[in-house]
Structure formats: structure tokens, C-alpha cells
Amino acid sequence: MTPPRPIPTLPVSAEAASDTAVPRLPTTVVSSWKGGVWKTCLSASIAERLAFAGIDVLYLVTDDQLDARRRLGISEADPDVARVQRGAGSVTVVGLAGPHAVDLLYRSGPGRFGRFDAIIVDTPPVKKGGCLPGVLLVTPTDGDDASANLIRMLRATPANTEIVLVRIDRVPKAEWAHDAGVIAEASNRTEGLVYLPDPLPRTAEVREALNRGRSVWTLPRRGMTLDFLRGGESLAGLAWTHARPGTTLPPLVPATPSGVHIHGWDDGA
């Protein structure tokens, strides 16, 4: 049997490849393919630090919005789109999921929520959290299981995304440097990947502040809390440079003295 004559196939221009897209505003994403690695703690801290530096930040939450809002001192009674002042700048929290978040980042922009200088994204612990192109991707890990998931996530990360590896929990710096090299090699990322050399400690003082909606940047700068803040400052500095190329993060206002620091006692606070 002779088949019927086929019609000609006409070309249709394709959308831009997702691995070359760039967000409408400078965007930092904090993501890990594992829960419990202080992901929301880091994203909220970075957003607040940028605001303290004088810019207006959109904090886009694609994970549990209530958790992120609570960490910024926003109650359930506050509006869905809530804004908090931090120094001369502000953080506006918006909860969007899936294609709605992508539409805001890459197509429509955040204009309906206000004017912003930068976007910080907090994602759920899923692989697609590392698949956003053209962003600064901060990826916390806290051990072998988390690192194995992280490697699988980074293998799917677009080439135009910059990656920052962060170690949560105290381990020797040399051990973390070795592990960071293993992660980079196993994820096939020879370029566009850096790491924070000092592991970030989990401190009760930081955890309690976030659970109460208090900014970590108002805590006494001592002991392990100071170590955490130094790491947060470095990450915020990268996010700032991503948003304001050629400039450096303005220094934080000096802390108010809070008395003597007792080594071994305050360190565990």
C-alpha cells in the first residue's frame, strides 16, 4: 500500500535554551537536595544582610513559606506579601511555587510586588533546586549523604550558574577542602565552582534567634556565633557582587559591646 503524501514540516522558532537563560534581576538561590542543612537559615541571613547594606530584596520562597516568614519575624496574621525593614533596606517575602516562581524570575519579573535590587530564592530540598540557570547557587551540605545528593544535583546545574559549596557543622578545614574538591570533580564542574573554606557551626544562639524572628545580624558577635556570621558575611558579599558588579558589600554597623566573652561557655551559646 502506498502511503499518502506527507505535508511539509515547517520550522517554529524555539524558546531560548534553559541552560543559557538569565533572571530578570540578579538572583541568589540557596538550595540543597537534603533537608536540615540550615538552607532557610542561610537564605534569610543573606537576604537580611543585603537589606542592611541598603538595598531592597525580594525573598522568594518556593519551600515552606511559613517557616521562612517566621524566621524574619512575620506572623501568620501579616499579609501574604510581607515586607520587613532592615536598616536602610528591606526584605519582601513572597511565596510562589513551580512555574509561577520561574515566570517571576525569567519572564514577567517581580514588578507587581514592588521595585527590587536583588532576589534571594529559598527552595525545597529537591533536585530541581539546582537547575535554575544564570544564578548564584549557594549549596549547603552537612556530610556524606548530603554530599552524594549534592553531586547528583550539581550534575544537572546549568553551565552559566555559579556555585558556592558550604559546609554546615564543625569539621577540620583540611577535611572540608578535600571534600569540596571531591564534590567538584564528581559533579564535573571544573569552572564556576568555589567553596567557603571555613565550615559554619550550628549554634543554639543563631537557631533561637531565627526561631523567634530576630535577625542574626543583631546578635552579639562572639564565639561560634561570630564564626557563623563571618561565613554569612562572605556569602552575602558574593550575592552583593552578583547584584552590584565592581562594588563591595558595605560594612555592617559595629556591634554594640555586650560584655566579656567567656571561652568555652559563650562558644556553645
List PLM regions with ranges.
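Glycine-rich phosphate-binding loop used to anchor ATP phosphates in small-molecule kinases
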Residues: 114-129
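Inter-motif core of Ras-like GTPase G domains
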Residues: 126-144, 162
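Beta-strand-loop-alpha "switch" segments that mediate conformational coupling across diverse proteins
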Residues: 168-219, 228
